[in-house]
């Protein structure tokens, strides 16, 4: 599955560095560029406000803090995003109930399908 013409550069927000590196590798293998990576809420919010990227992959739980404020900022900027979570539907936000979610662990094919849904 090829990358979308509109979505080329990704922001990855993930607090577990090994998982972040795995997601970065998957995105690279799928033909995307990782334009930014954040492991903490404050860092991710700065990137969400000022970063230059086309879409984002957000872990929901960042060391006990929820990533919904990041999603709010991305929505405000009109940047598509998807949530990646190992918690299934246990952690929810009414404001983002319709957001695309991918269940961890996932493989490249599943990530590609999720990205296609936000394109």
Which stretches of residues belong to each language-model region?
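Hydrophobic/aromatic residues positioned on beta-strands within the core alpha/beta folds
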Residues: 84-85
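Active-site residues of response regulator receiver
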Residues: 59
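Acidic, metal-coordinating helix/loop segments flanking the phosphotransfer/catalytic sites
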Residues: 37-55
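Non-catalytic signal-transmission and effector/linker regions of two-component phosphorelay proteins
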Residues: 1-9, 93, 107-119
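Two-component/phosphorelay signaling modules centered on CheY-like receiver
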Residues: 17-36
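Acidic catalytic/metal-coordinating carboxylates
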Residues: 66-69
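Conserved acidic carboxylate
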Residues: 14
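A Lys-centered signature of the CheY-like receiver
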Residues: 104
């Amino acid at each position: 599955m090829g990358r979308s013409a509109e979505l080329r550069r990704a922001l990855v927000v993930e607090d577990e560095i090994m998982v972040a590196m795995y997601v970065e590798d998957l995105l690279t293998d799928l033909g995307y560029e990782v334009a930014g990576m954040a492991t903490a809420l404050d860092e991710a919010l700065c990137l969400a406000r000022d970063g230059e990227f086309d879409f984002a992959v957000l872990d929901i739980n960042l060391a006990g803090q929820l990533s919904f404020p990041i999603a709010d900022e991305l929505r405000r900027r009109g940047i598509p995003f998807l949530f990646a979570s190992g918690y299934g539907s246990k952690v929810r936000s009414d404001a983002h109930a319709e957001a695309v979610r991918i269940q961890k662990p996932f493989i490249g094919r599943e990530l590609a399908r999720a990205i296609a849904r936000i394109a």
